[in-house]
């Protein structure tokens, strides 16, 4: 749904992250299987990407599949993997056409060889695009992310490239999967749930949080606008005083 908005362009978040929640409940309300909700959630992804590109957000990170989601029923996991491949096959050329870069964040080694190959192709095709960076967090968990960053730094210490005293928050940040990207300014979670679910724990240290009651497949430009308006009305202090 398109809506007329009037944001303060000087106060737009650079990096917005969204926990896309509520597909299963949305499907249940329709009397359908959970996979029906996931399929319709793709439309909300398109809307969110369009909105972010339209209003100058530089990085959009979407939580698509957590490392804990492997514990879901095998049929649902299989359907999600099929949907992932289908989305890459149909959407990447459109992203490239609109100058949008695609990154897949997470441990890709558990994916099938064909999916890993398609991910590499998609990231390579869009690598030099500059309008918007779209991060899809898939088989991602923040504990994994921070652990892997720690391993990278420990290996550098072991090889004598750095000393323990050289390790700073900035070096940890650069070892995370988000690397040189800006920290998250605004974290949105849909469906009314109010928890972080092991998502970008380091990156959201000073993020503003917005919890929407809208189920993800119904999340549209109006819903996104409400989150941006709320963000622009807040005073970010980053630990300082008023």
From Swiss-Prot:
One of its GO terms (molecular function) is magnesium ion binding. Substrate binds at residues 22-26, 34, 38, 66-68, 70, 72, 189, 195-197. It catalyses: 8 isopentenyl diphosphate + (2E,6E)-farnesyl diphosphate = di-trans,octa-cis-undecaprenyl diphosphate + 8 diphosphate. Its EC number is 2.5.1.31. One of its GO terms (cellular component) is cytosol. Binds 2 magnesium ions per subunit. The active site is at 21, 69 (proton acceptor). Mg(2+) binds at residues 21, 208. Pfam families: Prenyltransf. GO terms for biological process: cell wall organization; peptidoglycan biosynthetic process; polyprenol biosynthetic process; regulation of cell shape. Keywords: Cell shape, Cell wall biogenesis/degradation, Magnesium, Metal-binding, Peptidoglycan synthesis, Transferase. It comes from the Bacteria. Its cofactor is Mg(2+). PANTHER family: DEHYDRODOLICHYL DIPHOSPHATE SYNTHASE 2, DEHYDRODOLICHYL DIPHOSPHATE SYNTHASE FAMILY MEMBER. HAMAP family: ISPT. Belongs to the UPP synthase family. Homodimer. Catalyzes the sequential condensation of isopentenyl diphosphate (IPP) with (2E,6E)-farnesyl diphosphate (E,E-FPP) to yield (2Z,6Z,10Z,14Z,18Z,22Z,26Z,30Z,34E,38E)-undecaprenyl diphosphate (di-trans,octa-cis-UPP). UPP is the precursor of glycosyl carrier lipid in the biosynthesis of bacterial cell wall polysaccharide components such as peptidoglycan and lipopolysaccharide. This is Ditrans,polycis-undecaprenyl-diphosphate synthase ((2E,6E)-farnesyl-diphosphate specific). The gene is uppS.
């Amino acid at each position: 749904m398109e809506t007329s908005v009037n944001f303060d362009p000087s106060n737009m978040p650079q990096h917005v992250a969204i926990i896309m929640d509520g597909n299963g409940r949305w499907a249940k309300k329709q009397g359908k299987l959970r996979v029906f909700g996931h399929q319709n959630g793709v439309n909300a992804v398109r809307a969110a990407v369009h909105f972010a590109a339209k209003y100058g957000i530089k990085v959009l990170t979407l939580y698509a599949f957590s490392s804990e989601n492997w514990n879901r029923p095998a049929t649902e996991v299989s359907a999600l993997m099929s949907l992932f491949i289908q989305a890459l096959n149909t959407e990447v050329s459109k992203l490239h056409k609109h100058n949008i870069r695609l990154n897949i964040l997470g441990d890709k080694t558990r994916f099938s060889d064909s999916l890993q190959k398609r991910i590499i192709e998609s990231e390579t095709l869009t690598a030099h695009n500059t309008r918007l960076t779209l991060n899809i967090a898939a088989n991602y968990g923040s504990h994994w992310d921070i652990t892997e960053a720690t391993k990278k730094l420990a290996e550098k210490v072991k090889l004598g490239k750095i000393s323990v005293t050289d390790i700073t928050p900035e070096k940890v940040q650069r070892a995370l999967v988000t690397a040189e990207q800006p920290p998250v300014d605004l974290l949105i979670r849909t469906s009314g749930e109010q928890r972080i679910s092991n998502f970008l724990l380091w990156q959201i240290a000073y993020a503003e949080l917005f919890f929407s009651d809208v189920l993800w497949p119904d999340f549209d430009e109006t819903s996104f606008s409400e989150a941006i308006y709320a963000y622009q009305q807040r005073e970010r202090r980053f630990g300082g005083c008023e």
